């Protein structure tokens, strides 16, 4: 099958299509170009372009203000020196010049404030508007594609583009772009100013720029390498954490906390190693930058003095202007990397958007009613098909099939036989023409040499996920699907889908009301524009037909009840009935039922099946089913195997062929019903779920109670003290960090003093020898300061980064284990969801790193700087210092803090803008098939457009004030300088202070305020750190109480199974105030095969959870061999149990590692092979090239459902348990896989107690005892035959599933 890549050649005017490389994930790779970035601006309206133009001009103006400030400050220095040093300037003239220069500063302040506001507001709003437009275009383009396009993307990829990638793009085209223009303007203007005042001094001083650039370029590759590898290791650790949180019950059940914790810890230790590799280079970079900055001052003053004495410079101000201009260039060069990186990321983000926007869109077809009709047969002729995401694997092989109009056609067969593929082809999600795959943007490859083979390792990791894919030539797609003599490709796709009603195994409901979800079924039909009253009538009618009205009317909000995300507030049966109502309100000519009842319990299935039977009348109906009891009445049953029709006929007709596949499938699910009597009517009340059950479920979705009393939160100082005490092995490093940070902090007050001394030197004129000797001495002092500051900063950051990485790794590993050792009830709370706890396992220790690591070192430096500058300012000029401290320093502190905090938090603020539309996009993309099937594309895109429009309006309101605050914080320094200079000048005129006192105070105050404000902004966010510290300490305290070291009686087993007694159990889940058990009592004898059956919500799985001690009963006891399990050590007790759940929960790693999850690694191969033979999986494993060392991929994705389940059985048997718990272990398997798994269970049950929860009663009819649960109590118990003879609830359940009637 050929692949065409979604190139933007048409849009870019490229005449020749390039063939990109194919990545390891099968997707073509495309390299982003700057052309992608520039193309984004085509989404700008004329008003956006005008705003951009104004913003660029304003940014240039903002950038020029600082070089102009240097000129004014140089003039100040000259005039102050002339007045107080050489005394060549009269007092009145100095007073006049002082006022004039202060007015210049005030003008620069106001100009920067206004221009800063304009540029920030203009770039922010245009960025939001353009990003909104491109998100909308992407969203529309995505929903114009076929389903296979989404299939070609990794899971969650499209949602990530809308959310994270969209935010990245916005960053790169908004303020960051304005900052880029500003810094370029600053650099250019600074160069011009410096060379105008003294080209010779400029060239000499520029050596500092060259030195900084050269030194940074030397160490940066090593820093990048270390941080890149650290990020990779952290990503792998995060992958382990995510997988662990999603399979937490299985980890707890198998006592695998330590094993998973060790696996996680290996990646954390790797990340620490890489962080410590980069640490010395980060420290060296800091040291070199600060050394060169201070050294540049000494060099400039030394050489400037020489030029002044040689009359090549006419005043002191020229030296100041050149020096400050060069320092400004260094600062701009340092800061311009941030917007450059943002633009680079935005280029990649733009490419991500355009790969979908430019993707060729499928031909919609042109035929509609009356040219074609949906009431004719659908014919598949010689159809051969493979999915675009797996082009080498043939799914359908020359398939020929006729789906007759007005009749029910059921399609059955083993997994992978092509049943659901036929649905996809009829729905036109896929076609029989060559399919294309969306390309994957990749950044330009860097040099891979000397990288320790990391690239190869990463590629190998990626390839593991595709280990199961077959290779070979792509499958040649061919064949024809037609109706009314026309190919489906020629029929308008929206019209065709409007004739189809689809009900899937997992129905997707939007986070809206029941009424709106059902109403969605009318979109695209001729009733779409009917009056609201008519629509409401149709909704009610459809819900009645689907048996949904009965539970809807019992809800407090009725049809206006919100269903929650993906319908979470409704039970499975309720969701399914809403989906049926949504399908039949369309009054479709064709009804497709794809596993519509497979995930519903017996009682729910009975009701849903009745609704489906009613909906199928007089319609062309296609039914895909694993439960063959649901398709006995089909007009025609088609049996598939390996993509071909091998049998077809009625249920009765196919059963006559005892050698046929259908007979074997039925036999695998057959229930023995004993002697039948006439009139197998089912009690009427079974047609409807009990009001108690419905009410209970409804209440359970609304009312929640707190998990438990939360531990009292500790303050930041208390948490800091506790962590500080626990890290006493690192005290010596912390003490040294504190000492060197004090040395680094002393550099700023010392710099202020040296600056004043240098200014005084020029007061010795015209004594040139004195000036020369003094300038040499004080320039040497600058060099001493440069070396000292460089060493202090280097030592501070070397020690702090090393300490931080050590502390983070220690607590990250511990914290992850604390999480794993929590009770299962802990994870039921909304605040402790799987995703939240996976993220916290990395984020909370990172916050702790900020509390005790390098960022805190910056805070220490800032505090030492503040104390030092205040002390020296008060010592030299207390009056000016007090005014500055009371007025200027608070403003500078607040401005510096806010500005840097704003820059750090900008991305967070940016993300918040589109949060609602991002959620909606995520939901819509998750329902892609539902949207396509019900022709909801236009409605979805319109809703997304409305949300985006609202976000833009909200952003406009926020931007007005945020931009003003940012502009003020950015320009406040200039205003404060004007205040200090004016007041200081007045004090000089009055003779209260000399030149040295003034300049020491002036430089101290300005440097202290701005430097400290910036440094403090890098400090930890107090609220976040406090919350993270409390979570870590809180989980540790609860973990110690419940951990594996906890005391408790040792559980005693005598082999051959365990007797289980539940005595008067009362139980409700901690997060719901709805009783599950109300005095339940039952006994399972030693070595028995016991089955638990009953309606959904009857407590079957809850018994398994109680036996596993995931929860404790509120009242009553659970006894095993006469021992109360609550008194046993939970970890030793669980060693006697093994759990196999509906979700097999395999983890990344080899098959052997998964099988040995709950036991020691020292088990020999013979034992592993033996349990795999018992689980009927050994032969399959040995057929794999890597055998037991085969990687299973994330969540076992490279294995089929049946294979995963058999591996899970082998894992359970490996523990040689006394109790085997099987919770819906076969409910999602096809008949063939189920039969293999069932045989494995029956072998596994010998010599042990086996407790089985099942919906399919055929899997438990051989049980020694069957317990029928309902409404919190035991309704019936007995063997299969005994319960049939009683003709009670169990008999009714069997009637609804029987296959041989």
Swiss-Prot record:
It is a multi-pass membrane protein. It comes from the Eukaryota. Disruption phenotype: Does not affect the production of beauvericin but increases the expression of BEA1 and BEA2. The chain crosses the membrane at residues 54-74, 103-123, 177-197, 203-223, 281-301, 313-333, 745-765, 779-799, 858-878, 880-900, 961-981, 987-1007. Residues 15-30, 442-454 have a biased composition (Basic and acidic residues). SMART domains: AAA (SM00382). The keyword Nucleotide-binding applies. Induction: Expression is highly repressed by the histone deacetylase HDA1 and the beauvericin cluster-specific repressor BEA4. BEA biosynthesis is also repressed by the activity of the H3K27 methyltransferase KMT6. One of its GO terms (molecular function) is ATP binding. Residues 54-345, 735-1024 form the ABC transmembrane type-1 domain. Keywords: ATP-binding, Cell membrane, Glycoprotein, Membrane, Nucleotide-binding, Repeat, Transmembrane, Transmembrane helix, Transport. One of its GO terms (cellular component) is mitochondrial inner membrane. Signal peptide: none annotated. Glycans are attached at residues 229, 511, 618. Residues 1-30, 442-461, 682-708 are annotated as: Disordered. InterPro entries: AAA+_ATPase, ABC1_TM_dom, ABC1_TM_sf, ABC_transporter-like_ATP-bd, ABC_transporter-like_CS, P-loop_NTPase, Type_1_exporter. It is found in: Cell membrane. Residues 378-667, 1060-1296 form the ABC transporter domain. ABC transporter; part of the gene cluster that mediates the biosynthesis of beauvericin (BEA), a non-ribosomal cyclic hexadepsipeptide that shows antibiotic, antifungal, insecticidal, and cancer cell antiproliferative and antihaptotactic activity. Functions as a regulator of beauvericin production, rather than in BEA transport out of the cell. Beauvericin has low toxicity to the producing fungus and BEA3 does not play a role in detoxification and self-protection of the producing fungus. Belongs to the ABC transporter superfamily. ABCB family. Multidrug resistance exporter (TC 3.A.1.201) subfamily. This is ABC transporter BEA3. It comes from Gibberella fujikuroi (strain CBS 195.34 / IMI 58289 / NRRL A-6831) (Bakanae and foot rot disease fungus). The gene is BEA3.
């Amino acid at each position: 099958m050929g692949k065409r890549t979604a190139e933007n050649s048409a849009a870019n005017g490229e005449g020749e299509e390039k063939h990109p490389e194919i990545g390891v994930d099968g997707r073509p790779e495309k390299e982003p170009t700057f052309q992608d970035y520039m193309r984004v601006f085509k989404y700008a309206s004329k008003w956006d372009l005008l705003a951009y133009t104004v913003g660029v001009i304003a940014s240039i103006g903002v950038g020029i203000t600082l070089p102009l400030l240097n000129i004014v400050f140089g003039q100040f220095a000259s005039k102050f020196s002339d007045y107080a040093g050489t005394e060549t300037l009269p007092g009145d003239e100095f007073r006049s010049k002082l006022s004039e220069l202060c007015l210049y500063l005030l003008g620069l302040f106001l100009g920067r404030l206004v221009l800063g506001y304009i540029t920030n507001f203009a770039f922010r709003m245009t960025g939001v508007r353009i990003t909104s437009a491109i998100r909308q275009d992407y969203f529309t383009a995505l929903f114009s594609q076929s389903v296979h396009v989404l299939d070609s993307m990794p899971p969650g990829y499209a949602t990530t583009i809308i959310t994270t990638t969209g935010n990245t793009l916005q960053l790169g085209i908004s303020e960051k772009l304005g900052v880029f223009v500003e810094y370029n303007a600053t650099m250019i203007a600074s160069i011009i100013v410096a060379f105008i005042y003294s080209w010779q001094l400029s060239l000499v001083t520029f050596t500092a720029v060259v030195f900084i650039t050269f030194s940074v370029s030397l160490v940066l590759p090593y820093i990048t390498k270390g941080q890149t590898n650290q990020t990779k290791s952290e990503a792998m650790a995060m992958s382990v954490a995510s997988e662990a949180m999603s399979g937490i019950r299985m980890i707890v059940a198998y006592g695998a906390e330590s094993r998973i914790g060790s696996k996680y810890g290996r990646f954390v230790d790797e990340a620490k190693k890489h962080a410590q590799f980069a640490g010395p280079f980060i420290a060296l970079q800091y040291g070199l930058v600060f050394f060169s900055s201070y050294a540049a001052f000494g060099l400039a003053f030394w050489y400037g003095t020489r030029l002044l004495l040689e009359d090549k410079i006419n005043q002191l101000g020229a030296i100041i202007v050149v020096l400050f201009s060069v320092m400004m260039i260094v600062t701009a060069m340092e800061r311009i990397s941030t917007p450059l990186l943002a633009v680079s990321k935005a280029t990649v983000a733009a490419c991500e958007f355009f790969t979908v926007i430019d993707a060729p869109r499928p031909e919609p077809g042109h035929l509609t009613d009356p040219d074609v009709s949906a009431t004719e047969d659908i014919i598949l002729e010689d159809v051969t098909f493979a999915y675009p995401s797996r082009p080498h694997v043939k799914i359908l092989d020359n398939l020929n099939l006729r789906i007759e109009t007005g009749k029910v056609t059921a399609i059955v067969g083993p997994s992978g036989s092509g049943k659901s593929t036929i649905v996809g082809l009829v729905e036109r999600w896929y076609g029989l023409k060559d399919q294309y795959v969306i390309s994957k943007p990749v950044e330009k490859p860097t040099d891979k040499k000397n990288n320790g083979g990391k690239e190869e390792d990463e590629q190998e990791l990626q390839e593991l996920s595709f280990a199961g894919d077959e290779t070979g030539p792509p499958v040649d797609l061919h064949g024809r699907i037609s109706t009314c003599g026309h190919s489906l490709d020629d029929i308008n796709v929206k019209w065709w889908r409007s004739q189809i009603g689809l009900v899937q195994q997992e129905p997707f409901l939007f986070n809206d009301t029941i009424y709106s979800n059902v109403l969605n079924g009318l979109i695209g039909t001729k009733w779409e524009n009917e009056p609201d009253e008519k629509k409401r009538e149709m909704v009610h009618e459809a819900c009645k037909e689907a048996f949904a009205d009965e539970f809807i009317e019992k809800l407090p909000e009725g049809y206006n009840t919100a269903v929650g995300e993906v319908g979470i507030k409704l039970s499975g049966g309720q969701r399914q009935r809403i989906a049926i109502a949504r399908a039949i309100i369309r009054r479709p000519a064709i009804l497709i039922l794809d596993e519509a009842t497979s995930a519903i319990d017996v009682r729910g299935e009975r009701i849903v099946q009745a609704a489906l039977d009613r909906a199928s009348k007089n319609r062309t109906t296609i039914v895909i089913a694993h439960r063959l009891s649901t398709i006995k009445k089909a007009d025609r049953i088609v049996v598939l195997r390996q993509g071909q029709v091998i049998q077809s006929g009625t249920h009765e007709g196919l059963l006559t062929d005892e050698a046929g596949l259908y007979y074997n499938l039925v036999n695998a699910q057959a229930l023995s019903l004993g002697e039948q009597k006439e009139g197998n009517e089912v009690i009427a009340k079974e047609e409807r779920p009990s009001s108690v059950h419905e009410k209970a479920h409804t209440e359970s979705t609304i009312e929640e109670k707190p998990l438990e009393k939360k531990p009292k939160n500790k303050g930041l100082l208390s948490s800091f003290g506790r962590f500080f005490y626990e890290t006493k092995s690192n005290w010596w490093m912390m003490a040294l960090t504190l000492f060197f940070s004090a040395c680094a902090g002393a550099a700023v007050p010392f710099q202020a003093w040296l600056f004043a001394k240098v200014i005084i030197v020029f007061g010795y004129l015209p004594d040139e020898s004195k000036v020369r000797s003094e300038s040499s001495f004080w320039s040497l002092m600058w060099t001493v300061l440069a070396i000292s500051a460089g060493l202090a900063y280097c030592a501070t950051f070397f020690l702090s980064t090393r300490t931080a990485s050590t502390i983070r790794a220690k607590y990250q590993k511990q914290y992850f284990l604390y999480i794993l050792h929590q009770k299962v009830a802990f994870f039921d709370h909304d605040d402790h969801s799987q995703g939240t706890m996976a993220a916290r396992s990395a984020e909370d220790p990172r916050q702790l790193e900020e509390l005790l690591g390098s960022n805190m070192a910056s805070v220490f430096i800032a505090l030492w700087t503040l104390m030092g500058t205040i002390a020296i300012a008060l010592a030299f000029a207390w009056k000016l210092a007090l005014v500055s401290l009371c007025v200027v320093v608070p403003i500078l502190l607040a401005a510096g803090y806010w500005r840097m905090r704003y820059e750090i938090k900008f991305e967070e603020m940016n993300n918040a803008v589109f949060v609602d539309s991002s959620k909606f996009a995520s939901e819509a993309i998750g329902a892609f098939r539902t949207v396509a099937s019900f022709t909801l594309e236009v409605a979805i895109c319109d809703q997304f457009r409305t949300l985006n429009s609202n976000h833009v309006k909200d952003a406009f309101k926020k931007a007005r004030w945020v931009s003003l605050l940012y502009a003020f914080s950015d320009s406040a320094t200039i205003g404060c300088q004007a205040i200090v200079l004016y007041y200081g000048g007045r004090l000089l005129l009055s003779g209260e202070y000399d030149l040295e006192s003034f300049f020491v105070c002036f430089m101290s105050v300005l440097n202290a305020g701005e430097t400290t404000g910036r440094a403090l902004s890098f400090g930890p966010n107090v609220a976040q750190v406090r919350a993270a510290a409390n979570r870590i300490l809180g989980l540790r305290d609860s973990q110690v109480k419940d951990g594996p070291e906890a005391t408790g009686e040792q559980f005693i087993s005598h082999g051959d199974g365990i007797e289980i007694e539940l005595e008067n159990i009362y139980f409700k889940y901690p997060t719901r105030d709805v009783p599950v058990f109300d005095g339940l009592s039952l006994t399972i004898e030693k070595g028995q095969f016991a089955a638990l059956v009953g309606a959904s919500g009857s407590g079957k799985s809850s018994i398994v959870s109680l036996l596993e001690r995931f929860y404790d009963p509120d009242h009553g006891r659970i006894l095993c061999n006469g021992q109360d399990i609550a008194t046993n050590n939970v970890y030793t007790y669980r060693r006697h149990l093994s759990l196999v759940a509906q979700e097999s929960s395999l983890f990344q790693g080899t098959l052997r590692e998964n099988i040995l999850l709950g036991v020691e690694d020292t088990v020999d191969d013979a034992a592993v092979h033996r349990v795999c033979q018992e689980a009927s999986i050994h032969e399959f494993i040995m057929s794999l090239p890597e055998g037991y060392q085969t990687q299973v991929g994330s969540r076992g994705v490279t294995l089929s459902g049946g294979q995963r389940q058999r591996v899970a059985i082998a894992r359970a048997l490996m523990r040689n348990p006394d109790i085997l718990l099987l919770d819906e272990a076969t409910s999602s398997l096809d008949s063939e896989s189920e039969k293999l798994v069932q045989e494995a269970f029956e072998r596994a049950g010998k010599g042990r107690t086996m407790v089985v929860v099942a919906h399919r009663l055929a899997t438990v009819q051989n049980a020694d005892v069957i317990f029928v649960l309902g409404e919190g109590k035991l309704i019936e118990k007995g063997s299969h035959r005994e319960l049939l003879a009683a003709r009670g609830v169990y008999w009714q359940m069997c009637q609804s599933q029987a296959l041989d009637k």
